[in-house]
Amino acid sequence: MIITIGGLAGSGTTTAAKILSEKLQIPYLSAGEIFRQMAVEKGMDILEFGKFAEGNDEIDLEIDRRQAMLAKDKQDLIVEGRLSAYFVEADLKIWFVAPLDIRTERICMREGKTRDTVKKEIITRGKSEATRYQEIHGIDIGNMEVYDLVINSHSFQPEGIAEIIFKVTEVISCQQ
């Protein structure tokens, strides 16, 4: 089964994808990790690379290309990334939401930065990504119609989210 998991920064996609990968015993691929790897390749931090990518369509197209290439010919895979649902043929497409303050707190704990710094970075990064996605792909990141399931990750613990998704995969398997 191919599953895509997307969500804004700090919404819990990486945590849930890793737990689900272990639970289902299937590999996990992160578009965010591809983006971070490309930033390192260019010698930039995430915010710098995001701004650079905003003026360079080739960056987004390369991320999409790398993701599609790595996902190609897989029978079972979890693909985590904001646009994964648009570029990966999947049996289940999931989007995570969470309040800005919750996402800010999660990133603060993960990266050890101040709340104000993280909140500004989330807002800046979100605007940058929304602009790039609209300009390059014509995708409105706020449009949930492409997703089969939208989960408020603030409402559940990560293990509970993985269990919800697992149950949905069981339902899908029964319908095939």
Q: Where would I find each of the regions flagged by the language model?
A:
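Hydrophobic anchor at the beta1->P-loop junction of P-loop NTPases
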Residues: I5
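P-loop (Walker A) phosphate-binding loop of NTP-binding proteins
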Residues: L8
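ATP-binding Walker
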Residues: S11
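Walker A/P-loop
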Residues: T14
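Post-Walker A helix-loop "phosphate-sensing" segment adjacent to the P-loop in P-loop NTPases
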Residues: E22-L29
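ATP-dependent small-molecule kinase phosphotransfer cores
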Residues: A31-F87, L100-D101, G112-T117, K127
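Small-molecule kinase domains that catalyze NTP-dependent phosphoryl transfer to phosphate-bearing small molecules
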Residues: R115-I164
